[in-house]
Amino acid sequence: MKKLLLVLAIAMMVIPSLAQDYTRGRGFFVRPDVYGGFFANVGYQISPYVQVSVGPGALFLFNNTSNNVSVDFVGTVHGGVRVYTSGNNPWSALIDYHVGAFRYNRDPIWRHALVGGASYKDLDFGAGFQMMFAPNAQVFGYGPLVTVGYNFRFYKH
């Protein structure tokens, strides 16, 4: 029960990021982030991984004429490398690449992000940069990204 409450509390955390497009105005994209995935040990302290994160998402765009809000279910596949500290230290460093999609006014928007950060046990913290592309490959938005996520793993490192 305690673990479930922890997961729910972490799921309520959001990933704010700035999205800017000169035709649509300024805005931000938020979503809870809970991961599940596979980790493979290839060295004493290095583990490449692939994860899937899901959750509801919302894109808020502001301009001079109207304010647009799009809420949708968002899925992301991401992978990268973790470097673990030696001994029983619970900290690790990570480099993570995300690719995912969501809908805005019925159009799919592809989101790519590169994130660097740290992990304490199963809780990840990161910062990076993202770009979002509309269906015709035009840049829909871009900007900095802050991430907080929780990992469900099939085994512990």
Q: Which ranges hold each PLM region?
A:
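Membrane-embedded beta-strand positions of outer-membrane beta-barrel proteins
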Residues: 30-32, 54-56, 79, 93-97, ...
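Outer-membrane beta-barrel architecture
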Residues: 9, 41, 80-82, 115-119, ...
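Positively charged n-region of N-terminal signal peptides that target proteins for export
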Residues: 1-4, 20
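Transmembrane beta-strands of outer-membrane beta-barrel pores
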Residues: 34-38, 56-62, 83-85, 99-105, ...
